């Protein structure tokens, strides 16, 4: 799959600005009793990342979350959120 992420850009300190972006991957169709999301590490696989001459990824991390929504307070849903 190919995912595109858009981030809010704040250029107050241009050209020395830093941006923080997040990408959340999960399912609302199947709950945590049916779907297992187990990342191999907290570092995303950037092997297919296309570099840009305009910016660099300085740091990236991922976290697994168990989420309980108001509709179903006893049913866990899983997601992985990556921060760049």
Curated annotation (Swiss-Prot):
Record's catalysed reaction(s): K(+)(in) = K(+)(out); Na(+)(in) = Na(+)(out)
Cystines in this chain: 7-21, 71-72
Subcellular location: Postsynaptic cell membrane; Cell membrane
Record carries keyword Endoplasmic reticulum: no
Glycosylation sites: 20
GO molecular function: extracellular ligand-gated monoatomic ion channel activity; transmembrane signaling receptor activity
PROSITE patterns: NEUROTR_ION_CHANNEL
Membrane association type: Multi-pass membrane protein
Family: Belongs to the ligand-gated ion channel (TC 1.A.9) family. Acetylcholine receptor (TC 1.A.9.1) subfamily. Alpha-1/CHRNA1 sub-subfamily.
Protein name per the record: Acetylcholine receptor subunit alpha
Origin organism lineage: Eukaryota, Metazoa, Chordata, Craniata, Vertebrata
Gene name of the encoded protein: CHRNA1
